[in-house]
Amino acid sequence: MAKKRVTLPKDFDELLKVGDIEALKAVYDKCELTAYDGKFGLHTALHYKGVPDELVIWLVKQGLDVNIPDYYGGTPLYSQATFGMDTVKLLYELGGDIQKPDRYGNTPLHMAAEYFRPNTVRFLIEKGADVNAKNERGETPLLAALTVCGGIRAVPMAQIAEMLIKAGVEITPEMAEKVEIIGKDFEFHRDDFSEASCEEVDTALSKLYNIFGAKPVAKRIIHDGVSPILVKGSTWKEQYNELWDLLIPSTGAAKTVQGEVIRITGRVDDEINRNGGINWDRSYRNMLNSLPVHFAEGNALSEKEIEESKVLISKIDGKGLAEDGVITRLCELAVSWVILNPNPIPLGEINYNR
């Protein structure tokens, strides 16, 4: 008898979409029940999004362990919890462990919360999932969800928070801090939301502020592109933060040169110091090279400062690595130029897409 394959066929995704149960069962004439996707995750059919209930039942009856782990230790129920699929309920009925964590200590409830699946969170709570279980970072499902939540997820986040707190999760000061970050994220991107969506998110944020005792975030005031650009901060760092909130759009380039020099230095700072230069490319280099040009516009910086900016830029290598203080000084020079040029200067064509 020929040895069966340990990996699923490459077109298994397509077979799932078609949904022909007999064709799916036939896969296992040549594949082991434990056959996985052949990728790094080692996902069996039970881990797949959209796997038909009939196939799930058949595989388990044939002997496939309902709690078989993937590469990271995630069970099928764990994976389905991230998708928010009703397959979670079926797997539970078949013996799926609602508490079994992955190798990092994340339980199915952690994943349902982090992926903002309120219906799955409700089901897992009803079935006795430990709402206070902590992963290796010491996060409960609630804290984990708040940590990764952006403003766009405020509505399901509020629903999940109410359920978990009602189930016995203790509120901590750290949670209030996370809620304020969620509020700031939404305010920064508010213009990208429809009026109806804004109302929904505002309502959800109000709930979150009240639940966690967090300070409500003030609505963002965006520069009109015409009025003089004025700041109140007494230090350049305070002024930089003011200018960022005032001039930077949620996506794409700024409308004014003033906004763009602030945006460029901020984007480069984030890519180098937070992201380690992983996405560094020609666009980032072109952004940097535009700074001395902008610093020479309008009421220009001194020749010494413009030359300094060129030297600083040259110290950022081709992998996006820079000496300490280089980006900080460029940010400071950007603020200095904006202060010298309060009247908005429209941004022309650019040769980058970051």
Which functions belong to the PLM regions below?
Residues 93-134, 139:
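Internal alpha-helical scaffold/solenoid segments in large eukaryotic proteins
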Residues 134-354:
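Ankyrin repeat (ANK) tandem arrays and their immediately adjacent linkers/low-complexity segments
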Residues 2-49, 54-59:
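N-terminal segments that cap or nucleate solenoid repeat domains
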Residues 69, 78, 82, 87, ...:
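A structural signal for the main folded, soluble domain(s) of proteins
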Residues 25-33, 57-65, 89-97, 122-130, ...:
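Ankyrin repeat domain, specifically the short helix-to-loop turn at the C-terminus of the second helix
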Residues 14-19, 44-52, 79-85, 111-117, ...:
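Ankyrin repeat A-helix N-terminal signature
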Residues 5-12, 35-48, 69-80, 101-107, ...:
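Ankyrin-repeat boundary/"N-cap" motif
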